[in-house]
């Protein structure tokens, strides 16, 4: 056999309590005490369930109830009792005078539980969560990591700059891809060197041409005069007193003159 209902559902009010119902319940409890909650509604003239009357009295109408927010000492006591008793809110409320089990349960779920999670503590086991106090994943780099990354970037910057310069530097800077016929480019230094070489070669070429010209006109130059000998000396076979350019040697030959 099951337990009989405490009241008739057909004649029972449901919903929010009115001010008149609260006054009747308070007056009856003050006059007769709490007594039996199953018979209290009929004796007090209330069309309410016995359970509803009990919860209304305990949670809202008791004169010793504390009003206001929980204090820091109460928070610490609730955490300690919860670590020992778990979710047995009635036993926890018995050790907190002026607080109800329903009030403590609501306060635990809305405030203390979130506070423990924010501190890195598991609200069920009351032990620190693996991974430290931070329960949320942060994508911001730590200061030490940021400094190390900046130093590494600064160290790699010159190397990357050198590699970029080496890649961008042309392998053949003087290469001309224009398809046209033009004289080769000559530098000023090359021109000066060529002029010096021409100055060294020119006397020999002129001397050779002069020898050929002398033979062509029948005025040959003897070997002795060609080697620097004196004109008209012994062994000189120059004809008509002309040198290799066709001029008279007596006019251009100053070697016979004595310096005074």
UniProtKB/Swiss-Prot annotation:
- Give the DNA-binding residues: 37-61, 89-112
Q: Where in the cell is it found?
A: Nucleus
- State what induces this protein: By wounding. Triggered by MYB69 to repress lignin biosynthesis.
Q: Short name of one Pfam family for this protein?
A: Myb_DNA-binding
Q: Does the keyword Nucleus apply?
A: yes
Care to name a GO molecular-function term for this sequence? sequence-specific DNA binding
Q: Does the keyword Zinc apply?
A: no
Q: Which InterPro entries match?
A: Homeodomain-like_sf, Myb_dom, Myb_TF_plants, SANT/Myb
Listed transmembrane segments: none
Name its GO BP terms in alphabetical order: negative regulation of DNA-templated transcription; regulation of DNA-templated transcription; regulation of lignin biosynthetic process
Say which domain of life the source belongs to.
Eukaryota
Q: Could you say which tissues express the protein in this record?
A: Mainly expressed in the aerial parts and, to a lower extent, in roots.
Against PROSITE patterns, the record matches this protein to: HTH_MYB, MYB_LIKE
Give the matching SUPFAM superfamilies: Homeodomain-like (SSF46689)
Name the keywords, alphabetized: DNA-binding, Nucleus, Repeat, Repressor, Transcription, Transcription regulation
Q: What are the record's GO terms for cellular component?
A: nucleus
Domain (HTH myb-type): residue spans on this chain: 9-61, 62-116
Q: What does this protein do?
A: Transcription factor that negatively regulates the expression of caffeic acid O-methyl-transferase genes (COMTs) and of other genes involved in the biosynthesis of lignin, thus preventing lignification.
Instruction: Spell out the protein name for this chain.
Output: Myb transcription factor 42
Q: Lineage from the top down? A: Eukaryota, Viridiplantae, Streptophyta, Embryophyta, Tracheophyta
What gene name is listed for this protein? Answer: MYB42
